């Protein structure tokens, strides 16, 4: 199949019903057979590298976003194929090796994507095309599972939005699409989360020179926010000012990033930046962003 690039609303609408997901977990062998962090990958430098080729970034499928647990021992990501739609996969570091990616229990039957683990490691949020409770806003909708003594709880509805991100202080950010049918645009918003439920949205005063912001990624220390435009391309960063306002967005394509890159997320320590490009996940040293503070 041909690689897909990023995702759009029409793409996500096509992921509602899944059939035969087994092919999406194809891997060489039963475990990755590696003992290093980040699924055994050597950390990248200042030039982007393909992340975990053959394990996460697979030539036969499309991968877009993922999330690491705060201690780095778990990784969740989603994979898409033309035949089977989208499934949420995870790998764990167990007894010195990373396990082969497998589907998250309880999510089969509906497209699942854009996972995010909270910094307290107690909640896993993911967009899911499962029907929402009566009277609640629907697509795109987030659901959450709470960590238990034996794994994860049953999924529960969280609220509407796309591409959740959070920092160490427990502040969450999301793509607010609640008025899209009225103004045909998206917003980046701070969202209050209580017991896995989205209770309030506060739109941020961040506006790129063109397009509408989406897919926010807050840094672990909350000092900068990455986002993209045009449905998953053209990455920008906005640095937080001392007074708490957000600075003018910086176009990362002016600093060497491919304009087709989008869907950014960071390692829990902020050392590495991940992003989607041409249907795969790439990563690069996070200082490429930090170094822009002195320039911009």
Task: Name what the model sees in each region.
Residues 10-20:
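Bacterial N-terminal signal peptides
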Residues 6, 21-28:
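Residue-level recognition of alpha-helix boundary/capping or hinge positions
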